[in-house]
């Protein structure tokens, strides 16, 4: 029913959603985006993947100047390293960050031109948090959806490693009721 529709007062009309979910060669696609040399955050779901993608992009990049602008970021880095990466990104020394959701919490950099969701977000809240990094200065910015069907399976695997499965929850519930 239309009378139940809620309009979000925080809609940012400067953001352009780019549906790239059909892309087969993600690294090649990212390499093309890297060549634009605009502030970009590529969000991934694991620390390992952040490191792997940063290395793959460096390996493919023929431009030494651009190669030095690529960096990975995750919560496992030392606090001093994270601060330095944030500072260098803010100042334009770095322009292409591959990160877990750690690069988003408490970080307000207005001129981020591209946010790439390489993997499927774990929740709507996380999606909004990550996508919301783009275009905070009011300029046109892009949110690129690069995830695919396999990412659903990856999320389920990652969640299963950190969350109890149904059988364990049932057993726990029965134990509480006994």
Segments (PLM) and residue ranges:
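Interdomain hinge/linker at the junction between the two RecA-like core domains of SF2 helicases
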Residues: 1-35
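C-terminal helicase lobe
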Residues: 37-55, 61, 65-103, 107-178
């Amino acid at each position: 029913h239309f009378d139940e529709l809620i309009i979000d007062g925080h809609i940012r009309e400067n953001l352009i959603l780019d549906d790239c979910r059909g892309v087969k060669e993600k690294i090649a696609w990212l390499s093309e985006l890297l060549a634009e040399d605009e502030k970009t955050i590529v969000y991934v779901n694991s620390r390992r993947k952040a490191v792997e993608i940063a290395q793959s992009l460096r390996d493919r990049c023929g431009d030494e100047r651009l190669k030095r602008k690529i960096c990975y970021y995750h919560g496992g880095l030392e606090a001093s390293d994270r601060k330095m990466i944030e500072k260098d990104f803010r100042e334009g020394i770095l322009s292409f960050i591959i990160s877990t959701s750690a690069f988003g919490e408490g970080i307000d950099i207005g001129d981020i031109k591209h946010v790439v969701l390489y993997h499927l977000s774990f929740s709507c809240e996380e999606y909004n948090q990550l996508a919301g990094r783009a275009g905070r200065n009011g300029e046109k910015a892009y949110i690129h959806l690069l995830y695919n069907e396999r990412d659903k399976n990856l999320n389920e695997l990652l969640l299963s490693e950190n969350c109890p499965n149904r059988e364990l929850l049932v057993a726990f519930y029965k134990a509480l009721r006994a």
